[in-house]
Design a protein with these regions (language model features):
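N-terminal Rossmann-like NAD(P) cofactor-binding subdomain of oxidoreductases
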Residues: 1-190, 226, 290-291, 295-301, ...
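Charged docking surfaces used in two-component/phosphorelay signaling
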Residues: 67, 157-330
Length: 330
């Protein structure tokens, strides 16, 4: 099997390399692609040194079986035909094709069969916040249909890229030294602050990030589920957290939900609050599962249930989910 990584030098591209190294996939050849800025860089994979090739409109993708792409929406749109024209399946991490009717949007724990319905040979990876939420929601959906979801996200700096992480670190150092903090990657200082603003605002006063959670959840789950989200950037380096409230068609006991989460693929139950056992980014960073805890009956709605989930948005929220999509196609 011949695999390409497009955007190999970025945070997700580097995670692709690590995950392919870890998992027992039959990779006969791995080809790395990048922009002019990253072309020529060298990385090790399974004992071999690989050089990043410049992504161009040519026949470099001839013979490629799968292309894992994380280079931004504009690059994905521009190069989709180049990547797929010789038969490669493009698994795209950007927002470029997610809501296209003829492009499946896949989370393997939820809708793996959709991956085989890709007439354009493009499969979209959902947004990171959507991925971890639907992995958890699917466990509840198996018990009773979910009518509504309210979710507030606590999204780490790394969701905005490596430069955003560096800025958060720099802000802490600058403030500690009594200096004015550098503010470039976020609308405001993130250190010692939270910012209820991720992506641009839309006409309905929700941000694009929040509307992604609405539209993507419905497409992935093939459901009329209604999702109202508030997405917040918090001064955490890595791993996103979500406070989730669901209304189901029938009342669910917390014990039922715990059992469902414990049995759900991709979920690790951490729900012993009396013993201070609950998910946190501190423990989830660098890990694969979606961690779920703080499961409780809602006090304001008979059919309501609340829980808290945490996951590494670079692994399960991006690179791992894409590799799992590839694995479902083998």
């Amino acid at each position: 099997m011949k695999i390409a990584i497009v955007g190999a030098s970025g945070a997700v591209g580097q995670e692709f390399l690590r995950i392919l190294e870890e998992r027992p996939l039959p990779v006969d050849e791995l080809v790395l692609f990048g922009s002019e800025r990253s072309a020529g860089r060298k990385y090790m994979f399974r004992g071999k040194e690989l050089t990043v090739k410049l992504l161009q409109h040519n026949d470099d993708f001839r013979g490629i079986d799968f292309a894992l792409v994380s280079a931004g929406a504009s690059t994905s749109r521009e190069f989709a035909d180049t990547i797929t024209k010789h038969g490669a399946v493009m698994i795209d991490n950007s927002s470029a094709f997610r809501m296209d009717a003829d492009v499946p949007l896949v989370v393997p724990e939820v809708n793996p069969g959709d991956a085989r319905q890709a007439p354009r040979r493009i499969i979209a990876n959902p947004n990171c916040t959507t991925i971890q939420m639907v992995v958890a929601l699917q466990a509840i959906e198996r018990l009773s249909h979910i009518r509504r979801v309210h979710v507030s996200t606590y999204q780490s700096a790394s969701g905005a890229g490596a430069a955003a992480m560096a800025e958060l670190e720099a802000q802490h150092a600058e403030l500690g030294a009594g200096q004015a903090p550098t503010v470039e990657k976020f609308a405001f200082q993130l250190a010692y602050n939270v910012i209820p603003h991720i992506d641009v605002f839309t006409d309905n006063d929700y941000t694009k990030e929040e509307m992604k959670m609405f539209h993507e959840t419905r497409k992935i789950m093939h459901s009329d589920i209604r999702v109202s989200a508030t997405c917040v950037r918090v001064p955490v380096m890595r791993a996103h957290s979500e406070s989730v409230w669901v209304e189901t068609e029938r009342p669910l006991l917390p014990e039922e939900a715990r059992a469902a989460f414990a049995a759900a693929p991709g979920v690790v139950l951490m729900d012993e609050p009396a013993d201070k056992v609950y998910p946190m980014p501190l423990f989830a960073a660098g890990q694969d599962p979606v961690y779920v805890g703080r499961i409780r009956k809602d006090l304001a709605c008979d059919n309501g249930l609340a829980f808290w989930c945490v996951s590494d948005q670079i692994r399960k929220g991006a690179a791992l989910n894409a590799v799992q999509i590839l694995e479902t196609l083998l």
